[in-house]
Amino acid sequence: MPKYLFWLLWRAWFYILVTTLIVLLLPLLFLLTAHRQWYRALYWVMRHLWATPILYGMGFLPKIRREYKVANDHNSYMLVANHCSMMDIMLMFYCSENPFVFVGKKELAALPLFGYFYRRVAILVDRKSPQSRKQVYSQAKERIADKLSICIFPEGGVPDDESIVLDSFKDGAFRIAIECQIPIVPMVFYDAKKRFPFRCFAGSMGVMRVDV
């Protein structure tokens, strides 16, 4: 029973932490989402003042092994990683100094508060609509022209079956990278599913290993 109570309180703390940080950052978020050219400043805020405090505040210690450093060098990259936890978003921010734009499912735009800013800065895709997928290509090219990187989880979502370690990849990320002639930077999140799965009564604090 104490273990289940811990998991319940720990999950509640996650949502409190995410929401509290957004509320505290509201003035900056409203300001920096007002103009597209301010995205780099917004990215710094999200990386250092939102994602990093969430990771450490939840008791996670990211350990990154780098074969390739994604530096803030005004070059564009296609960042791809396995998708297995809500923590993947925070981990991706933590791993990349280079500002990127997420390509993500439109359903997240319906979330209170978070969804408002998500709509303003991310490239939204309706996975059931071929027209929406075409629009993703054009929007991604615009952001690459702005010298920003693109981040896509090529599995297209988190598999419902938790026994699946890596689901089949959609080809969108690779098509965009080839067409725009930008390097693909693969990342592997080893521990996110174990540390913070989508199931409520599971997970643990500890190291989160990442290969870049």
Regions found by a protein language model. Name each.
Residues I64, L79, F102, V210-V212:
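Generic preference for hydrophobic
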Residues M1-T33, K69-N72:
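Membrane-interfacial terminal anchoring regions of lipid-handling membrane enzymes
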